[in-house]
Amino acid sequence: MSEGLQRCFVLHRRPYSESSLILDVFSEEYGRVTLMSKGARSKRSNLKGALQPFTPLLLKWSGNGSMKTLRQAEPISLGLPLAGINLYSAMYVNELVGRVLMAEVAMPAFFHDYLHALTELAHNENPEPALRRFELALLSAMGYGVDFLHCAGTGEAIDPSMTYRYREQKGFIASVRRDNLTFMGDELIAISERRFITKEQLKAAKRFTRIALKPYLGGKPLKSRELFMPTIALSRARSIGK
């Protein structure tokens, strides 16, 4: 049972029976929680339009099992203004949280990282930097500790002009080979600072987070990624045509 109203976001919702909803929510104080909202789909329900992803909510629930019962819900504000590729990117963020985080593990600091990511997506045209910062915050919240600033082999500071190869659970070692697991030193420094100045640094961050998140996602593809691939292709086609 929650102690009072809790700040939450709906990650995913699905219909249940004729008039109810099952909600997967991410809360500030309780982490990821599954809720049953009885009667939320009925015509008389005042919650019908409120229990949506990307709308800041105050929720209260009861119950001790894996599925709680929603008792009270209040929208804090209107939903975040997300559209196009940024909407699909926010759906990707929600799917990652739902897939990777364990249920009912409090992560108040990461909740703020999540909120910051959605806010960035709502107010910036290019979603890529926000997505990379969010993925890195997620890895950090799960205890995925990687030192981007020191060579794992020697302990020396990363040289921006050198090439380093990533070794899972160990870090980065100097390398003369170039493949999917190697990164330039300046790219590693940019990832550590979560500040991406060049396209190459942003691409390197994406490549690293894909490698690091793969064990947590298993072989099951992300649905949100499949949804926004046609949108990305269309956007690229329009850019070429200009």
From Swiss-Prot:
Keyword DNA-binding: no
GO CC annotations on file: bacterial nucleoid
Assigned keywords, A-Z: DNA damage, DNA recombination, DNA repair
InterPro entries reported in the protein's UniProt record: ARFGAP/RecO, DNA_rep/recomb_RecO_N, NA-bd_OB-fold, RecO, RecO_C
Residues spanning the membrane: none
Superkingdom of the organism of origin: Bacteria
Pfam family, one: RecO_N
SUPFAM superfamilies xrefs: ArfGap/RecO-like zinc finger, Nucleic acid-binding proteins
GO biological process assignments: DNA recombination; double-strand break repair
Keyword Endoplasmic reticulum tagged: no
Chain's role: Involved in DNA repair and RecF pathway recombination.
The family this protein is said to belong to: Belongs to the RecO family.
Record's protein name: DNA repair protein RecO
Species of provenance: Vibrio atlanticus (strain LGP32)
Top-level taxonomy: Bacteria, Pseudomonadati, Pseudomonadota, Gammaproteobacteria, Vibrionales
